[in-house]
């Protein structure tokens, strides 16, 4: 049976036989996996074996006279060396095991120490997190009031707890600075109730101060008609700056009556053509600076805006309006404001050019006489007139045409278009339109309506 060999990369590696166990190979080769490789001492190396083999060889070469006693002594020496080598290997293994066990124990001890340190730190943190509120109440450093409360501890420094003062509504930290910003300063001011309270208090105090110096026009019923407070200084300066002409006009023209009756001013119907032809400007609405006056009634009698309109006649079937209701509207005549040319006039802005205004060069008596002559309540009013078309002849004689700037023509018939005649009916039946007035020709809609009116009549 040939010796088993392994071929590796073209080389044959011979294997030793299983039955032969060499003492030198058992100690010089590698051990099993379970064993730890141990470096043998110099006495167990193969050099000694070579020397011994060399000695034995020399001994054999010298002669065969060596007896059995010499062979036995050599085997005893080998056994002693083998035993010594085994003892040294066992000692080395025990030393390695002790070193590994000591390293493992050291690691376990360090991990245990780290765990104990972490546990101690966690307990300390839990103790710090569960800090109790201070029992001692600290006074507020701003207002020295004891109405304070503890809020919480500072996140960065536990030695600086934060407190809150209920009186001055401010926070502060013990050992730190006081916050001058009140609570809720970042919010809108109209939401904070404190600001509302302060605003109401200021208004009431201002009204209380104004009630002392007030000149009111009292109504007989006890209600205030006009109120001039202490803040309306312009009214007093205006009253002092006006001339006596305006004062006399105010006395003669303004009459305060009960609100139920109103102010009734009768205008004569038989006005001359001169008076009817002059169109007076609208009276000005009085302007009082300062707070608006308080009116006890829903109607506004002083600042009545007079509209230049012509109300419809009674037979136009306006619901809820009687024929005499249009004439019952009342107006208060207003005095003409002073001219802007007067340097003493306190009013600002544009002014109307009135004839009654006093010029700087005229004397006071002349202006007063001129004011009495020229100031008539009929000229200062805009009275709506009703033009009735029941009688065309009377309507043609009315002065409203001159007011509107339409000249009368005695030969021409103004309302001839509204009269139906037999000639026009015959011309309409023939299909021809009769001659019309220029007023109707300028307005084709009125012309068509008049034609339809004539056809229907």
UniProtKB/Swiss-Prot annotation:
Main location: nucleus
Chain positions covered by the region annotation Disordered: 1-130, 334-377, 417-457
GO BP of this protein: flower development; regulation of DNA-templated transcription
Record's compositionally biased regions (Basic and acidic residues): 74-94, 106-118
Signal peptide location: none
Residues bound to Zn(2+): 140, 143, 165, 168
Gene Ontology molecular functions: DNA-binding transcription factor activity; transcription cis-regulatory region binding; zinc ion binding
Pfam families per the UniProt record, alphabetical: Zn_ribbon_Dof
Biased composition (Acidic residues): 45-54, 62-73
Compartments where found: Nucleus
One GO CC annotation: nucleus
Superkingdom assignment: Eukaryota
Disruption phenotype: Early flowering.
Keyword Mitochondrion included in the entry's annotation: no
Low complexity compositional bias, start-end: 337-346
Induction remarks: Circadian-regulation. Highly expressed at the beginning of the light period, then decreases, reaching a minimum between 16 and 29 hours after dawn before rising again at the end of the day. Regulated at the protein level by ADO3 and GI pos-transcriptionally.
Keywords: DNA-binding, Flowering, Metal-binding, Nucleus, Transcription, Transcription regulation, Zinc, Zinc-finger
Annotated function: Transcription factor that binds specifically to a 5'-AA[AG]G-3' consensus core sequence. Regulates a photoperiodic flowering response. Transcriptional repressor of 'CONSTANS' expression. The stability of CDF2 is controlled by 'GIGANTEA' and redundantly by ADO3, ADO2 and/or ADO1.
Subunit structure: Interacts with ADO2 (via kelch repeats) and ADO3 (via kelch repeats).
UniProt-recorded name of the protein: Cyclic dof factor 2
Species: Arabidopsis thaliana (Mouse-ear cress)
